[in-house]
Amino acid sequence: MGPGPPAAGAAPSPRPLSLVARLSYAVGHFLNDLCASMWFTYLLLYLHSVRAYSSRGAGLLLLLGQVADGLCTPLVGYEADRAASCCARYGPRKAWHLVGTVCVLLSFPFIFSPCLGCGAATPEWAALLYYGPFIVIFQFGWASTQISHLSLIPELVTNDHEKVELTALRYAFTVVANITVYGAAWLLLHLQGSSRVEPTQDISISDQLGGQDVPVFRNLSLLVVGVGAVFSLLFHLGTRERRRPHAEEPGEHTPLLAPATAQPLLLWKHWLREPAFYQVGILYMTTRLIVNLSQTYMAMYLTYSLHLPKKFIATIPLVMYLSGFLSSFLMKPINKCIGRNMTYFSGLLVILAFAAWVALAEGLGVAVYAAAVLLGAGCATILVTSLAMTADLIGPHTNSGAFVYGSMSFLDKVANGLAVMAIQSLHPCPSELCCRACVSFYHWAMVAVTGGVGVAAALCLCSLLLWPTRLRRWDRDARP
C-alpha cells in the first residue's frame, strides 16, 4: 500500500539516496546471482560428467537444494520480520544478509570441489551424504541473502520511482553476474583445459569433459565467492539501514475508529479460495520450469547430444542470456500494444519454435547459436510477463502479497527439483558416465522441457483467456 498524504506535523520524507548508496545496495545480491548462475547451469554437468556420479545421485542433490531453498525462503522471511527489533544498531535486514553471505561463502566452494577424504573405493552414497549438508547450508544462506536484500527496498526508499530504480540497478548487476560466470567459465575451460593436453594426445580428448576438469569448476567456484565477497563487503560498507520507529502507541489525537478503506483487505486464507490464485500460480510454475530446466539441461544437450567442444557450455548460455536481456527492453512497448496475455503467447511461440527446431534437426552445428537466441528471447519474454501477471493479480492487496509471492516461489522451486529428479530417474545409463542412448535422451529431454512444458503453459494461458482473473470482494470480519 502506498503512503497516504502527509498529516499535519508529520516528519518530513527522507532524503533521496545518493548514487553511491544506490550502487552499494544494488551490488548486495551480486554473490547470490553469481552462485545461482553456476548452480543451475553447471551442477548436474559437474556431478555427472566430471565427478562421474550417477544421474539419479546428481538429480537427488539438486532436488535437495531446491526443496531446502523452497522451505527456507518463507521461514527466513518470517524470522526476519520477527527479529526486526534485534541488531538495531547495525540493522536487522543487514544482519540477516551478513549471516546469509557467510553461509554462502563457507559452503559454495565445497559443492564444486572433490569430496574430502573420498577415494576410488568410496561408495557414491557416502559422497552424496558429504555434499548434502553443504548444499543445505548454501541454500539457507542464499535464501537469507535474497529475502533480506529484497526487504531492504521499502526500508531505504519510500518513493515508487526510487523503488523501481533500485530494482532496475539490481537487475543490471544480475546481468553482469551472469556474464561474469559464463565468461570466466569459457576462459578457464580454454586456458586450463588446453594446458593439460600432452603433445602426443588427440586434441579432441581435451574438448571432452571429464575428471581432468575438476580444477576448472573448483577455480570457478572460488572465483565466484571471491568476487562476490568483495561486492558483499561494498554493500555492507555503503548501505545504511534506517532505524525503524517503535510501534506507535495510541495518542491523544489517534482516532478511535480506523477510516473505512475503499478496498477490503485480502488475507492469506482468502487467496486459497480464489481460482485466479491457482491459475496464475500454475502459469508461473510452468514458466519457471521452462526457464530453469532449459538452463539446467542445455549444457548436457550440448555435450552429449550435439557432441560440441566443452567451450560451448559457456558460450551458448552467454548467448541465451544476452538475447534475453536485449529482448527484455521490448517488453514494455509490446505489452502496451497487445497486452499481457498476447505478449506471453508470443514468447511461448518462440520457445515452441525452438523446441520444434531441436526435435526435427538431426544436428544443429553452428546453428545452435541461432537456436540459443530464440530460446533466450522466449524465456525472457514469458518470465517478465508472468511476473507482471503476478503483480497484476496482487494489485492493491499488498498486505498479503508476500504470501502470494512466497507460495508461488515455493511451488516453482519444489516443482523444478522434482522435475529434475524425474528426468534423471529416466536416464538410460544411470551407472555409467555416458552411453549411446544419452544422445537421444538429452535431445528429447530438451524438447520436453521446452515444448512439452510450453504446451502446458499454453493451456494455463487459455484458462486465463476463458476465465479472466477477477478477485471477489471479501469482508475481513466475515468468518472463512
From Swiss-Prot:
Residues in compartment: Lumenal: 48-56, 119-124, 192-218, 303-310, 424-446
Keyword Magnesium: no
Chemical reaction(s) catalysed: L-cysteine(in) = L-cysteine(out)
Residues that span the membrane, as ranges: 27-47, 57-77, 98-118, 125-145, 171-191, 219-239, 280-302, 311-331, 348-368, 369-389, 403-423, 447-467
Modified residues (Phosphothreonine): T254
Chief place where the protein resides: membrane
Name under which the protein is recorded: Major facilitator superfamily domain-containing protein 12
Organism: Homo sapiens
Gene: MFSD12
